[in-house]
Amino acid sequence: MGMFDALRGRRRSGGVRKPDPASSAYLVSWAQARRGVEAYVEPKTTVTETTVVLVAHDGEWTRRRITEHGARGLGKKLGIPVYDVGKVGYPQRMRDYTAKLPKVD
């Protein structure tokens, strides 16, 4: 923070945000409402924190910010497999599902 930033009301940006407990609750609810769910952990990038993508049997998916440890714990709690997307990639059914979605202009 610069010397005058505090006087101007500027705040530092960046830093690690803590995962939202509501996100974990949402992921549990989402997974329990679908079958054949698998978790794919996406690594931290310069733009985003670590995230997990849950993919159902039909390719429907959802993504939320969560720690890798949290994602593994979620998988254990739900009894679903957890994969590292950097090693295994995304499942084809996820790409097929996304391709069928209506295009937004």
Predicted segments, located by residue:
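Intrinsic disorder
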Residues: M1-D105
